[in-house]
A protein has these predicted regions:
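Long helical/loop segments within the catalytic core of UDP-sugar-dependent glycosyltransferases
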Residues: 104-141, 153-236, 247-248, 269-312
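The conserved acidic donor/metal-binding loop of glycosyltransferases
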Residues: 92, 146-150, 234
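N-terminal signal-anchor transmembrane helix
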Residues: 29-83
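Membrane-embedded multi-pass helical conduit in multi-pass membrane proteins
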Residues: 34-36, 44-48, 313-414, 446-514
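Juxtamembrane inter-helical linkers in multi-pass membrane proteins
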Residues: 384, 411-434
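Acidic donor-binding segment of Leloir-type glycosyltransferases
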Residues: 72-118, 122
């Protein structure tokens, strides 16, 4: 007779697997829908007889390393000067403001309508800065660019014709990656982002589902922002929040997968974790705020279902952590499944195949498909990155699960910006020096938990290895050993990377005090 502990363990385990399998199935659906809608490329309704007024908004906070490069690119945009306004939305507390003022004076002398809107109070963070700037912006349309983006000269000539359709509220371009080849972390991030942009955003737009503004590299119709209720401060992903509100008002969005606006990726684990934490927590905040409203809205069922999947997908990180915890009783012998439950067949059919296929192969297929879209002639070069990609995805589970819990239970936090280092002629030493100007992650809890999980899976790997050496491994041993290798590598990578940064920060602070 199975014990109550075993019963609840099995029930929870299967529910977690079903949840993860559901999100894995959604990835497969994205690939299928892309094939179905790949030819539905959006086309502009017409051309402007006279170019409309556009305001370029550049929100920044302590971005002194990238502001000059950004303004060089913005002032090189091919658009009539008398139809272009540039707003630097600066909330900086360092010497970025003085640098911005120098740049404003320089470009004013060249005939640009440029100004720096400086706030001492960071109320609402980026959303607050955009809200204040919209009130004084001259343009009917707003091109928003984060400080690390480098727009091409034709960005407005390409995007503006789509606004000849009066129902279009937003034109979003695809993110590119300036430092894709910098290190292993940037290579893996670029693949993650390519999956989101090349597949998810493209499919959502071309199949008449809702997609969201990515916070930058897009052009808004200003009146649509006001119609949707404007920028609100109650989430840290104000772009996602506004996107759903505007689309539920009946406005249309356009996503240009073939037009790329390049940007800088975080080059260290601290920056990557901070960015992922903000995106994950913000998505859960929007889920709490908007999901009920979305289901009450008079929009197609497929749009409601896709929005639900989009807003809840980050709960998979919590499920992944729970799965790692649930594995422990089996590996330590606390759960001893009985023969009555036909454990061998269940493990083969449900546990092994489901976990391996939906949590591994679907992810592989999803990102390979994305790279085939982004780099059709060189996509095969990412094969050696697939296993590190899977490992990093698992390794980020603790960091992102923490963000899910904070978002779900309403914990507020500071808007932590992503480190941006810009181009440096002095090489890596200069980058390391610049990184000291950004806050390191001080909390040791997440990296310690990551290392604990990594140590547990290391012990499992050693056990499997010993069994194999003694010829005691069963027929599934090799597959389980491969599956458990991913969390072992992922948790150690994320945990050690963060711990090293924390130690460096402690040493730096000690040296300053001395």
């Amino acid at each position: 007779m199975i014990s109550w502990f075993d019963f609840f363990w099995l029930l929870t385990y299967f529910l977690v697997l079903i949840g993860l399998a559901g999100y894995g199935f959604h990835r497969l659906m994205m690939v299928v829908l892309y094939v179905k809608h790949r030819k539905n490329v959006p086309q502009p309704k017409g051309q402007w007889e006279e170019w409309p007024m556009v305001t370029v908004q550049l929100p920044m906070f302590n971005e002194k390393y990238v502001v000059e490069g950004l303004l060089r690119k913005v002032t090189a945009i091919d658009y009539p000067k008398d139809k272009l306004e540039i707003q630097i939305l600066d909330d900086s507390t360092d010497d970025t403001y003085e640098l911005c003022q120098q740049q404003v004076e320089f470009y004013k002398q060249q005939g640009f309508d440029i100004k720096c809107l400086h706030r001492v109070d960071r109320t609402g963070y980026k959303a607050g800065a955009l809200e204040a700037a919209d009130m004084v912006a001259k343009g009917e349309f707003l091109l928003i660019l984060d400080a690390d983006f480098r727009p091409e000269p034709d960005i407005l000539k390409v995007t503006m014709p789509y606004f000849t359709d009066e129902k279009v509220a937003l034109v979003q371009t695809r993110w590119g990656h300036l430092n894709r080849e910098k290190n292993m972390l940037t290579k893996l991030q670029s693949i993650f982002l390519d999956g989101h942009f090349a597949l998810e955003q493209t499919v959502r737009n071309r199949s008449d589902r809702f997609f969201t503004f990515n916070g930058t590299a897009g052009v808004w119709r200003k009146c649509a922002i006001f119609d949707g209720g404007g920028w609100e401060h109650d989430t840290i992903t104000e772009d996602m929040d506004l996107s759903y509100r505007v689309q539920m008002k009946g406005w249309n969005f356009v996503y240009l997968n073939d037009y790329v606006t390049p940007a800088e990726l975080p080059e260290d684990m601290d920056g990557f974790k901070a960015q992922q934490h903000r995106w994950t927590k913000g998505c859960i905040q929007v889920c709490r705020k908007m999901l009920t409203t979305i289901w009450k809205a008079k929009i197609p069922l497929k749009a409601k279902l896709e929005a639900t999947t989009h807003l809840t997908c980050n709960y998979s990180y919590l499920a992944l952590v729970l799965l790692c915890v649930l594995i422990m009783p089996v590996c330590t012998g606390m759960v001893q499944p009985s023969e009555e439950w036909a454990w061998t067949e269940l493990r083969m059919i449900v546990l092994t195949l489901t976990l391996f296929f939906f949590a591994t192969l679907t992810v592989c297929g999803f990102y390979i498909a994305a790279e085939m879209i982004v780099k059709p002639r060189r996509w095969w070069r990412i094969f050696y990155l697939i296993l590190p990609l899977l490992a990093l995805g698992v390794g980020m589970a603790v960091n992102n699960a923490k963000a899910v819990l904070e978002g779900a239970f309403g914990k507020s936090c500071e808007f932590v910006r992503t480190p941006k280092f810009g181009e440096s002629k002095e090489g890596q030493k200069s980058i390391e020096k610049r990184s000291q100007g950004y806050k390191a992650i001080k909390s040791i809890l997440v990296p310690v938990l990551e290392l604990c999980f990594g140590g547990f899976f290391l012990a499992i790997e050693i056990t499997f290895l010993m069994c194999a050496l003694n010829f005691n491994a069963d027929s599934f041993g090799a597959l389980w050993q491969f599956i458990f290798l991913l969390p072992f590598l992922g948790f150690f990578y994320t945990g050690l990377s963060s711990l090293c940064r924390i130690v460096e920060g402690m040493r730096s602070r000690s040296a300053k005090k001395a």
